[in-house]
Amino acid sequence: MEEDAKREWRDIRLSTIGSQDYEDIYSGRRRTALENLAHRYKRFAIIGLLFVIWAPLTFYNPEIQIDNRLTIIIFSSIYFLTCGLMDLWLYRGIRSIDCASMTIKEVATRALFYRKRHLQFIAILLPFAFIWIGILCYNLCDNTAFLWGVGLGALAGFAIGIRQLMKFLNDYRSITED
């Protein structure tokens, strides 16, 4: 009788889960919101740090004057290094949240702390991104194709950034709600 009750309870619980969710849960591919945040921060940190290597390689452009080229390389390297290190710090902070040993209040408090830092980092880095784009456009204002590329790249980056920010905020919301 007890086994029948357990089986019926499990069937009721699983009937509310979609088939894809059911497969994800039992295959181990399903991640928590904390794991999603950590994974996303790690990916952004790696991308930011890779762009530090990319910056000097791609700005070897003969159209830019030598002294301006060095300024662009230094500014972009510092910018991407800062982005990567900030994301790495957020990644390590999110990974340090342990739901098994912390109370719900501690988990929520730390998640809100890192959410606040994330938004502060955006507020710091966004003006520098606009300055970086402005420096590039100023130095290559004669090259129409480059200006179109910068404009379209900025629009695409803005759209992707907003989408990723919404994913970050949704994960933070799912951690701190209730």
Model-identified regions with their sequence ranges:
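Select subsegments of transmembrane alpha-helices in polytopic membrane proteins
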Residues: 40-50, 116-128, 162
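Small-residue-rich transmembrane alpha-helices that serve as helix-helix interface/gating elements
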Residues: 147-160
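Short membrane-interface loop/juxtamembrane segments of multi-pass integral membrane proteins
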Residues: 27, 100-118
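Selected alpha-helical membrane-embedding segments in polytopic membrane proteins
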Residues: 18-20, 24-88
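Short, charged cytosolic
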Residues: 1-25, 92-95, 99
